[in-house]
Curated annotation (Swiss-Prot):
Belongs to the synuclein family. Pfam families: Synuclein. It is found in: Cytoplasm, Cytosol; Membrane; Nucleus; Synapse. It comes from Saguinus labiatus (Red-chested mustached tamarin). The modification Phosphotyrosine is found at Y125. This is Alpha-synuclein. GO terms for biological process: chemical synaptic transmission; regulation of dopamine secretion; synapse organization; synaptic vesicle endocytosis. The lineage of its organism: Eukaryota, Metazoa, Chordata, Craniata, Vertebrata. Residues 111-140 are annotated as: Interaction with SERF1A.
Length: 140
């Protein structure tokens, strides 16, 4: 604990010196702050390396233990999202509720939403009449 206090004290001295002086104070503060950080780093290097290695190993173990549960959770969320999208499509009139079939696994059937018209501005599209079109024949 004394190591940390001594290092922080040196850093604090640097900050105080910077506040009292201008350009010279800033340079001195930088030097003392660096000195304090290096002091703490040199005294705790071995402990930090061991601690980081231990934390990394424990994290790896926990990720392995939780990994299966996360995959299951993501699958459930995706399923509920697809079901919700189908309900919204039916409620807005894009598809009829009787077209929202379910497969044997309970998942919506593929291709249900593929034929839905895309309308980003929420305006109805009308096809132009064929009278305004001319036949085009490319030149050879």
């Amino acid at each position: 604990m004394d190591v940390f206090m001594k290092g922080l004290s040196k850093a604090k001295e640097g900050v105080v010196a910077a506040a009292e002086k201008t350009k010279q104070g800033v340079a001195e503060a930088a030097g003392k702050t660096k000195e304090g950080v290096l002091y703490v780093g040199s005294k705790t290097k071995e402990g930090v390396v061991h601690g980081v290695t231990t934390v990394a190993e424990k994290t790896k173990e926990q990720v392995t233990n939780v990994g299966g549960a996360v995959v299951t959770g993501v699958t459930a969320v995706a399923q509920k999202t697809v079901e919700g999208a189908g309900n919204i499509a039916a409620a807005t009139g894009f598809v009829r509720k009787d077209h929202l079939g379910k497969s044997e696994e309970g998942a919506p059937q593929e291709g249900i939403l593929e034929d839905m018209p895309v309308d980003p501005d929420n305006e109805a599209y009308e096809m132009p009449s064929e009278e305004g079109y001319q036949d085009y024949e490319p030149e050879a």
